[in-house]
Amino acid sequence: MTERGLLIVLSGPSGVGKGTVREAVFKDPETSFDYSISMTTRLPREGEQDGVDYYFRSREVFEQAIKDGKMLEYAEYVGNYYGTPLEYVEEKLAAGVDIFLEIEVQGAMQVRKAMPEGIFIFLTPPDLSELKNRIIGRGTESMEVVEERMETAKKEIEMMASYDYAVVNDVVANAVQKIKGIVETEHLKTERVIHRYKKMLEGLQ
């Protein structure tokens, strides 16, 4: 029986740099995760590609997937749905592949209930003023939406205690190293190592 893969969930408030950190994690030659691409009803930002950054789908398609039980998690955020298709995640974990999710806080709490064995990492900004500057710096949001995102971010930061780890995204390279360290630590936990040796011993009988 194949050892089940790790589910690594990276989450945090809007504007904290989840996407940037995720991209850096996957560019690192020492990482070997599979990335579960999220589905969203929001419009693509400049440079984003369907099937690479997100699956960009209509509201009707997304709501049908919810009704059909095909979403591991989903949330409505600032008027748009975001969520994780279930089938891909289950298939990869069962095959022993580590899966990396980059999702919103609401969605992460749903995954926590569905798959409590996951590793939940909260990405934090150095401070709230820096977070606001990052959101404004995108140049894609009105000030009304910026303020709405900031109010949501304050509530989300209060939920940090529901996560296993917190990583400050001050310098992207530093955040990546910390995430790599967390995953390595989880792979070395005795319950996983014992399980591996039990299978080896069973094979000798």
UniProtKB/Swiss-Prot annotation:
GO terms for molecular function: ATP binding; guanylate kinase activity. One of its GO terms (cellular component) is cytosol. Its main location: cytoplasm. Keywords: ATP-binding, Cytoplasm, Kinase, Nucleotide-binding, Transferase. It catalyses: GMP + ATP = GDP + ADP. Its EC number is 2.7.4.8. InterPro entries: GK/Ca_channel_bsu, Guanylate_kin-like_dom, Guanylate_kinase, Guanylate_kinase_CS, P-loop_NTPase. Residues 5-184 form the Guanylate kinase-like domain. It is found in: Cytoplasm. Pfam families: Guanylate_kin. It comes from the Bacteria. ATP binds at residues 12-19. Essential for recycling GMP and indirectly, cGMP. Belongs to the guanylate kinase family. This is Guanylate kinase. It comes from Listeria monocytogenes serovar 1/2a (strain ATCC BAA-679 / EGD-e). The lineage of its organism: Bacteria, Bacillati, Bacillota, Bacilli, Bacillales.
